[in-house]
Amino acid sequence: MQLALENISKKVGAQTWLYDMDLALHSGAVTVLLGATQAGKTSLMRIMAGLDTPTAGRVLVDGADVTGMPVRERNVAMVYQQFINYPSMTVAANIASPLKLRGEKHIDARVRELAERLHIDMFLKRLPAELSGGQQQRVALARALAKGAPLMLLDEPQVNLDYKLREELREELSQLFAAGQSTVVYATTEPAEALLLGGYTAVLDEGRLLQYGPTAEVFHRPCSLDVARAFSDPPMNLLPAQAATSGVQLQGGPLLVVHLPAESATGALTVGLRASALRVQARPGDLAVHGTVELAEISGSDTFVHASTAVGSLVAQLTGVHHFELGAPLALYLDPQQVYVFGEGGQLARAPERRKGN
């Protein structure tokens, strides 16, 4: 299915929920809608599904205008944050329902396959009311996958799941999407989820479409400060700077010898540095930034250390478990070639060169 939105906007009363935008999804691929709460992800999905109509603009499916077509006439599967299951039917019957409507063969085998992939095979004989919220959400997700609709819309489908299960299911979902032929739209607030799912990413902020493209490209070359903020977890370190003759001068810090395009080589700049680009051991060509430890926390297999420095507050993401004394002096090292530079208006002026395989 080729879904395209042309000059879509949505107003409710005096409020604008979606500003004018164009978005053409890639058929058979995953498109992630990435943005904070109230970025416009759900509003956009409801228009895609036919649950809402835009105030202006058109919705096209394979070139045909379906803007006013009700949802019941569209072949769409949608999973909401708030799961919806048939309460009087067992888990197995819930998952099997779209398969039976299509008259498919080997229904039991397909139901069990999906249940196993989503870790709910032990609940097949239970009713939804006997399950936890996270388990019910997985039932709704399995039913949507079973439907095999040409357009599948998933609105933060893992929001009710615990951290460990989310990590397990992300890879499973990526494989399930790749194995199917549906055009998938997946809304999330988590950059890590977008990176794992791959495909394409549309970054939304307060109803505006900021950037759309291949996920890796959007992550590595955010077109603006707003995109960089939305597509960074932990947040990108953003530091005030000035253009200099041979590069960028950090305010209160070292000179970064990097090339800037002529139109960005003057005035106030912002340097962006991902937390993973900072380290505590120097490599050839690195520059040092000195400060003191404000906070250190371990999350999973990484350590996050927050430091107060002359160039501003910095957060470094270090692989492995590291121990730091609060208030202790700390030297963080960075490779100038790994910095982003944004112009005075927030537009991207420079991005690090991508390494092979990234």
Segments predicted by a language model, with ranges:
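Conserved coupling/switch loops of ABC nucleotide-binding domains, chiefly the family-specific signature
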Residues: 55-58, 206
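Glycine/charge-rich catalytic "coupling/switch" loops of P-loop NTPases
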Residues: 247-297, 322-358
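Helix-to-loop junction immediately C-terminal to a conserved catalytic motif
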Residues: 49
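The feature captures the beta-strand-to-loop junction immediately N-terminal to the Walker
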Residues: 34-36
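ABC ATPase nucleotide-binding domain helices that frame the ATP-binding cleft
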Residues: 42-45, 139
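Conserved ABC transporter NBD signature motif
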Residues: 57-65
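ABC ATPase nucleotide-binding domains
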Residues: 75, 81, 85, 90-226
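Conserved structural motif at the start of ABC-family nucleotide-binding domains
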Residues: 3, 18-20
